[in-house]
């Protein structure tokens, strides 16, 4: 049970604390605060939260082209005629797309891998959307692939693997500049730092 509430907390409350505690970035104390806030809140607020979660699960899908989250397929970025279809920025997660869009620097398309290569965690290239990326590169007029994986061991390993696969196709491959701290995640970078990393990208 959650955070030592086995005997003093009613089971429905303890179960919800457990569920919040399973979410990334939410520890036992934060989970408890959220649940006890909802206990004090009006019923309508709890219902709105529950309905929003279910609506998100029911209506959100992955774009069949770039694998970003969307409510329509293909997504609005892939169907935007003003985007530069000759550039593709490869990221690990949908949150990285949000971070890069906030910079206002990138006007091309995206490809979301949904993870990074990590032998320790048992994540291999075939577990990611790499096969789909290579298929896109063979049929779309892409001239540059910007590898925007996180600046950590897993991100670097993924970028190196992708570069080995893509360069023989005759496509330019670049990597974000090292303005980002080692071990950080793109989603937490501020817009200025991320924008400069994009502008200063280097050849691989």
UniProtKB/Swiss-Prot annotation:
- What PROSITE patterns does this protein map onto? RECR, TOPRIM
- Name the UniProt key words of this record, in alphabetical order: DNA damage, DNA recombination, DNA repair, Metal-binding, Zinc, Zinc-finger
Q: Which HAMAP family match?
A: RecR
Molecular function (Gene Ontology), one example: zinc ion binding
State the name under which the record lists this protein.
Recombination protein RecR
Species in which this protein is naturally found = Herpetosiphon aurantiacus (strain ATCC 23779 / DSM 785 / 114-95)
Which positions fall inside the Toprim domain? 86-181
Tell me the protein family, please.
Belongs to the RecR family.
Q: Which domain of life is it from?
A: Bacteria
Q: Which GO terms describe its biological process?
A: DNA recombination; DNA repair
Zinc finger (C4-type) residue numbers:
63-78
Q: Where is the signal peptide?
A: none
Sum up the protein's function in the record's words: May play a role in DNA repair. It seems to be involved in an RecBC-independent recombinational process of DNA repair. It may act with RecF and RecO.
